[in-house]
Each structure stands twice: as C-alpha cells, then as structure tokens.
Amino acid sequence: MTTHYESVHPVTLYPDAFHVAAPDTPVAHDLFPRRPGVFIRKMQSTDPAPVLEPTPVLESEPASEPTEPPAREKPVRELVTGQFGLVPPWVKSVSDAKLRSTKLVNARQETVSTSNHFRATWLNAQRCIVPMMAFFVDDLRSGKPVPTRIARVDGKPMGVAGLWECWTGAEGDTITSFTLLTVNANSHALMGRYQHGGTEKRMPAVLNEGSYDAWLTAHPQKAREFLRAYPANWLLANPVQK
C-alpha cells in the first residue's frame, strides 16, 4: 500500500508537466493519509458539451475521398485541493469519514469496479491524476524496514492514476478527497524487491504523459487499459537518508 508520497516541487513544474496552474496555497512536501494534497481532473461544467459541425465540402472539390472528421477538443484540466484518502459518497458522518478515509488511500485496479468503497466513483468516471515527484516503500530485505524513495529516472514529475470524490454530509459539510489506483507488481523487476515477503506486491499506476487526457475522458471499461505497471528501467530507487 502506498501511504506516503512526495508532492511536486518546485511549483513551477505544474504548468509544463501537467498543463495546469500552480497551486494557490503551499502543498506539504510529504503527503500522508488525511493530509491535504492536490489532484488534476477534467474541468467540471454544467454546460452541455459543444457540438462540432463537420467542415462543409464545396461542390467544386472532388468528393472521391472522405474527409476526416474534426478532432474533438481536448478537455480542460483543473487542479483541485483534496484530502489524501477517499470518502465514499454513502458515508453518514464526518467522524465516519475520518475513520474510513485513512484506509482508502489506495484502490486496487482489479476490484475498483466492484468494491463497495469505489464502485460508484469509478462508474461515474471521477478519474484524476495525482501529481508527485516520488512515492515511498519499505525495503525489508535486511530484516528491518528501510524507507525507499521511488522516482522517475529523469527526475521529472509523475502522474499517478486516481479517483476523486466530493462527499456532502447531512449538515452541509463537504470533503473533497482522492485515492491512488494501484496495480500488481509481483513480477516487476524493481518493485518486486520491496514490501513484505509472502504478500502481494503493489505499486501506484503511473500514467504515460501522453495519455493524461485520454485517461480523464475514457469510458470506464476503456479506462482499465491505462492501469499498468510502469517500466522498471524508467524508475530509480534510493534509500531515504535519515
């Protein structure tokens, strides 16, 4: 389970890496369950999507070859502040939300569409991208846990697949929250070394940069195709110096 990750810094990286404005308020360097972090989603709008009309073909132009339809406009992304640890929409109270969200910082891609905690959020296509510089795992090969930082080899920010939710209580309280989607890493050349032996190895579903918009807009059945283990040779592991 990924319960600790490092936020993007400096904040000037947000526009180039994710095509969103930098956060208005500082984000903690290290994120843990129930701490406020940020995520990126498709901009929410109550307006109907514009209908793109096909380009007319003049009578003088040859009509032997069909013209390609105009490309659909890319979704506008927005950066949102939320709690790390998802609060399901059916939670009854703030106190219950606090208890449950601590355990809901990760969602397994294999069961996300059937889990009582995440099913509604997944089917509503409330997908997001969680920006980070690195995530942390324990190296237990020596017999004691050694916190280890996992980052991209090139040092650039990572965009991890996630889900977001906005819970509203009976008294009007609201909590915006998010969770990280994870995939199996038993056979992963790097991540297979870490975490507890004899248990299933997991890792966050790091997205390819070119698939961000497609991930945010895909149909739920199609969205599963984006949830894959990130190549080991694109990642770098370093023990955390105390």
List PLM regions with ranges:
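Short linear sequence motif anchored by a di-proline
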Residues: M1-K242
